[in-house]
């Protein structure tokens, strides 16, 4: 138990020193990370344009470099940027949700030029946390490159329950 308390005290001291140094640079307007985090918003209306492969690759690399428990990288990421495939996914989701209003499923994606789907490993209890960290890195790196995003939970119910998904 002593080791634990000493470690916590050491961590608190290191954090306090680190925070005071970071705070000064943020006051000077020089902390791009804090500015990026504080300015990011969910975007629900997209321009009719494509996102370049190099840009997508950079964003995904930022995502998979997120911290994760025991470096298990307990996720799978799928990226869809083909409008025909996106329409197929939307059609499957609408067919799997007969109570949905016509067009409401397509509306939830709001014309986004790219969709990314992140799956976690259900056998690892920290995987949902790891996937959340990955998602946050994706959204923040996209924002820093001038791309907006929105995190959607509603498609998850369909994707987890439909065999054709």
Predicted region positions:
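Positively charged n-region of N-terminal signal peptides that target proteins for export
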Residues: 1-5
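Bacterial N-terminal signal peptides
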Residues: 7-16
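Acidic, surface-exposed loops and disordered segments
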Residues: 19-165
């Amino acid at each position: 138990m002593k080791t634990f308390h000493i470690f916590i005290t050491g961590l608190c001291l290191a954090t306090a020193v680190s925070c005071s140094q970071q705070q000064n640079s943020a006051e000077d307007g020089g902390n791009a990370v804090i500015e990026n985090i504080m300015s990011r918003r969910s975007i629900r209306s997209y321009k009719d344009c494509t996102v370049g492969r190099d840009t997508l690759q950079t964003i995904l690399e930022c995502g998979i470099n997120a911290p994760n428990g025991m470096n298990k990288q307990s996720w799978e990421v799928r990226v869809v940027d083909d409008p025909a495939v996106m329409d197929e996914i939307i059609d499957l989701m609408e067919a799997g949700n007969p109570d949905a209003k016509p067009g409401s499923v397509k509306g939830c994606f709001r014309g986004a030029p790219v969709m990314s789907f992140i799956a976690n490993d259900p056998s690892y209890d920290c995987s949902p946390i790891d996937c959340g960290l990955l998602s946050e890195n994706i959204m923040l790196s996209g924002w820093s490159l001038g791309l907006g995003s929105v995190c959607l939970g509603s498609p998850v119910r369909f994707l987890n329950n439909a065999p054709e998904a």
